[in-house]
Structures are given as C-alpha cells and as structure tokens.
C-alpha cells in the first residue's frame, strides 16, 4: 500500500512538472520592433528573451485611476506607458545587458499591473518621456499590485523634462501593493527619484548604484516599507529618506556627494540607520526631522558633510529637528563636518560609544578601513561582523556587509 501511494505521488509530481513545462514557453525577440505584441501574445509564466538591439515602444495614453502621491488617492491622473505587463507573470530577460535596450518613450516606461510573479533582467531601460500631468508617477519601471524581481538592469538616461512640471522621470517606482526585489541595478542620470515607494509598496534594494538624478536617491513615502543594503547613493539632491508612516531599514550604504541631506526620517516614519557611510553631502549628514519620527542610528561614519551653502538643513554631521528621546544613537564616528558635528543636540562624543576622530579610510572616497582605523571592532557590541567578532563601524561592519 505504501509503495502504491509513493508511486502515485511521484506520478502526480511528474504530471505537474510536465504540465508546467508544456504551458511555459520561451520566446525570443531579436528582429522587428514590436516587443509589446510579443508581451501580449505570451502566456502566464512565459519567458521573453530580448535580443541585442534597441526596441522602441509606441507610447499609449491612459488614465491612471489612482494617484501615487496625492492627498486624495482616488485622483485620476493622465499618463502614458511604453510597455505593459498586465494580469499575468512574465520573465523578460535581455541577451546583452548593454545592448538589449528598451526605449520606452513614455512616462510609465515598463508598467507591471496585477502581475504576481514577474522578472526583468539583464537589459537597459531608457528614453522615458515626462507626462504633462504633474501627478503622474513617471519612472522607467513602475509596478502596481505586482511582485517583480528586477536584477542586473541599467535604468539610465530617462531625463526628459518639460517646463510646466517640476518632477521628471524617475528610475524604479513601487505603487499600491508592489513587492519589488531590486538587485545589482545601475540607476543613473534619470530626472527624478532613483527609487520611490508609495502607498502600500515594499522593496528589498541591494547592491545598486543610484547616481546623478534629481529628487532623492531612495524615497520611501506614505506607508511603504524598504530594506536597503549595500547601495551607493550619490549625485542626487537628497540621499535616503523615510517619510509619512513608512518603515525603512538602511544598512551598509554609501550615501555620498549629494547636494542636500544624506539620510533623514520625518513624519511618523521609523528608520534603522546602521553601518552606513554618510560622507560629503552638501548640507546635513543625518537628521531626525520630526517629533514623531523614531529609530536607531548606530555604527555609522558621518564625515565631511556641509560643503554647500545651507539649503535644506544646517551644514553639520547630525541635526536634531525631532524628539531625540525616540532615537537610539550610539557607536558612530561623527567627524570633520563643516559647521560642527552636532546641531540642536548636545555633543554626543564619548557618549554611548560615539567618537569624533578620523575614521582612517585607505583613500579619498574609498571607504575601506586601514588596519589601524579606530572604527575596527568598536561598533555596537550586540552587532557582530560576519566572522563573529565585534562589529566594525562603517560600510564593512555588521552581518550585511560586503566582503572586500
């Protein structure tokens, strides 16, 4: 009897596997230009391989029934999309990351809607066009009510602007119900936030370069959630920000050379800021920005901030514009910030493991620690490095650190 049950179980598995393999197809697009036709033709679960050529989308206007960043969410928005994946799951993979190019010519470049298990990888997304409606959450990739893995994608040069709208075209935006897994992407020279998350969106963002844009490198708003590990955020107006009632965990990021602030939390947001390097930002490095924001700031190196004339916050390392009692602040190196290391809070040096000394990087903008660095083995005693020793302060400390 047991053998018969086992045999029946194995037959059932074989039948399931066979059914899946029969139902899922791989479609290769290497000629022509109508990628959307292939997307429309593909069935749920199919894979589309995009050849090494440029594909130009024919943009289509539509009315977005919800507004991502309006006070009244049910505000209709006039927008456009280049490619749309709707009510099914697809894997869209380029055959050459640099040469498989999707030029979207639209506000919502690649738009995932009600797509429960899709993936986008190994290609370039470029050429977005700003919509005239300022409420449109334009970005190279936009997802709503979708689970999308976005790996090894170059999101570049979506920099079209129009005079009547301040915002431009961003990099990757999560809308209502989006669950995004963004890894090893190069998001550069776009016209608004690098990554933005709106109502009900969540994202895991790892090992990305987010560079040279307007807005924030990573902006998390409303009730969105974000975990960001090992990213470089540079050349934006602002670095990594938590707004509204959002929840952000930001570990081991290099937030450097942005025009305004480095990392802030405002509204009623929670932010866990650990093992980051916040270096050479134009105004303040790190700031609790409201009395209701809360979180933890530990194991960070906050240095050389304040090189620019004051714009959005004082030119200091740490600015307290909130309720300091709601923040755990310890084991940080805060040093050499232009107008002081601290503002609107007493000097934290030699309190809770905080120090104010040269962290001892091996070179300019190379944040590896020298062997004699005061940051080695002096981090939070309850945070361990990958080898089990007490954590280092900075990028290469803690369990999420990248090995060098």
Predicted regions located by residue number:
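C-terminal accessory segments
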Residues: 352-402
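Predominantly extracellular beta-rich ligand-binding scaffolds that present long acidic/polar faces
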Residues: 239, 247-370
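Acidic glycine-/aspartate-rich tracts in secreted/extracellular proteins
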Residues: 53-56, 96-99, 307, 334-340, ...
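Right-handed parallel beta-helix/beta-spiral solenoid domain characteristic of secreted/periplasmic
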Residues: 52, 56-63, 69-136, 157-159, ...
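Right-handed parallel beta-helix/beta-solenoid
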Residues: 16-47, 51-67, 359-363
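Feature marks extracellular polysaccharide-active and adherence modules
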Residues: 51, 93-95, 113, 121, ...
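Extracellular beta-strand/beta-solenoid scaffold signature
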Residues: 64-83, 104-111, 132-142, 162-176, ...
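Solenoid scaffold repeats with emphasis on beta-solenoid/beta-helix
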Residues: 48, 83, 90, 100, ...
């Amino acid at each position: 009897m047991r053998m018969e049950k086992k045999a029946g179980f194995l037959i059932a598995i074989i039948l399931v596997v066979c059914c899946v393999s029969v139902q899922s197809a791989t479609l290769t697009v290497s000629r022509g230009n109508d990628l959307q036709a292939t997307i429309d033709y593909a069935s749920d679960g199919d894979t589309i391989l995009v050849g090494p050529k440029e594909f130009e989308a024919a943009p289509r206007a539509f009315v977005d029934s919800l507004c991502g960043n309006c006070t009244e969410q049910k505000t209709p928005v006039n927008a456009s999309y280049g490619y749309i994946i709707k009510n099914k799951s697809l894997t869209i993979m380029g055959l050459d990351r640099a040469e498989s190019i999707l030029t979207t010519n639209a506000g919502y470049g690649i738009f995932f809607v009600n797509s429960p298990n899709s993936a986008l990888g190994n290609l370039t997304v470029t050429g977005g066009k700003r919509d005239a409606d300022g409420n449109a959450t334009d970005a190279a990739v936009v997802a709503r009510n979708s689970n999308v893995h976005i790996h090894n994608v170059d999101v570049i040069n979506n920099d079209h602007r129009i005079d009547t709208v301040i915002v431009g075209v961003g990099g990757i935006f999560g809308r209502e119900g989006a669950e995004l897994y963004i890894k090893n992407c190069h998001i550069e020279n776009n016209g608004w936030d690098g990554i933005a998350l709106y109502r009900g969106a969540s994202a895991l963002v790892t090992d990305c370069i987010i560079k040279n844009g307007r807005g924030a490198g990573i902006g998390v708003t409303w009730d969105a959630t974000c975990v960001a590990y090992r990213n470089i955020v540079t050349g934006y107006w602002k670095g990594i920000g938590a707004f509204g009632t959002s929840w952000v965990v930001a570990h081991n990021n290099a937030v450097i050379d942005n025009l305004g602030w480095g990392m802030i939390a405002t509204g009623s947001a929670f932010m866990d800021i650990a093992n980051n390097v916040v270096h050479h930002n134009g105004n303040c490095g790190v700031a609790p920005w409201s009395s209701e924001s809360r979180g933890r700031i530990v194991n960070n190196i906050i240095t050389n901030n304040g090189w620019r004339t004051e714009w959005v916050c004082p030119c200091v390392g740490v600015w307290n514009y909130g309720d300091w009692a709601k923040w755990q602040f310890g084991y940080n190196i805060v040093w050499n910030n232009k107008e002081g290391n601290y503002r609107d809070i007493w000097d934290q040096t030699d309190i809770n493991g905080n120090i104010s000394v040269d962290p001892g990087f091996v070179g300019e903008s190379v944040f590896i620690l020298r062997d004699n660095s005061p940051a080695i083995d002096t981090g939070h005693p309850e945070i361990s490095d990958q080898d089990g020793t007490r954590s280092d302060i900075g990028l290469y400390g803690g369990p999420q650190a990248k090995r060098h």
